[in-house]
């Protein structure tokens, strides 16, 4: 991917393009220096004496902020996750490959300042995403940085990971794809049901303490609860018992339709 040639931070054309770009991300800077710095690669400094700092420090800050916001979001949204599942899910969201992908999707590379001979890599774009989060925090505070991370990093990634892990559990056991159903009862309970070929194989009813009414969040909670259940001692034999039950049902059907011998 070839990087666009951009001029110094005081260039009005650059400022206008960057302002439009940030506006589309719902970012309206108070201090432009943070955001201009967020796109300056270390190699650029070597060729421009009037530029003294790259995005490295902002990247360091943004990395820590992303890690914290994602951890806090997982902890609050999914109370049924144990420590191991929380950690594994967080790693999938904040890992470099994922941040690189999101940075590329957001087209952050269009604004990166590199030396003339440097190549723009996906890793650099991921670093810039972290630096941008750091810039948002420095200029606009924790609330805005949290909103950005939740919208552009957490929400873009988590549902994909959760669904993949959930359905993979059944694929690994060579079972059909399950169906997840959720509903709210009149006494504010969340009723979660998982079906396989029309049969209910797991269900739970828990208080809706957070007053969620978003169906996708409720479904995510149901998947998380089921996954956590499988990792508990009670769920350790779930699939073996389920498969045995399915085989017994098949056998009963076979016997029921078997013709009588003359």
From Swiss-Prot:
InterPro entries: RNase_III, RNase_III_dom, RNase_III_sf
Domain of life: Bacteria
EC number(s) from the headed UniProt entry: 3.1.26.3
Keywords carried by this UniProt record: Cytoplasm, Endonuclease, Hydrolase, Magnesium, Metal-binding, mRNA processing, Nuclease, rRNA processing, tRNA processing
Chief location: cytoplasm
Any one GO molecular-function label of the UniProt entry: double-stranded RNA binding
NCBIfam families assigned to the protein according to its UniProt record, in alphabetical order: RNaseIII (TIGR02191)
Quaternary context: Homodimer.
Protein name: Ribonuclease 3
Organism: Mycoplasma genitalium (strain ATCC 33530 / DSM 19775 / NCTC 10195 / G37)
Primary gene name: rnc
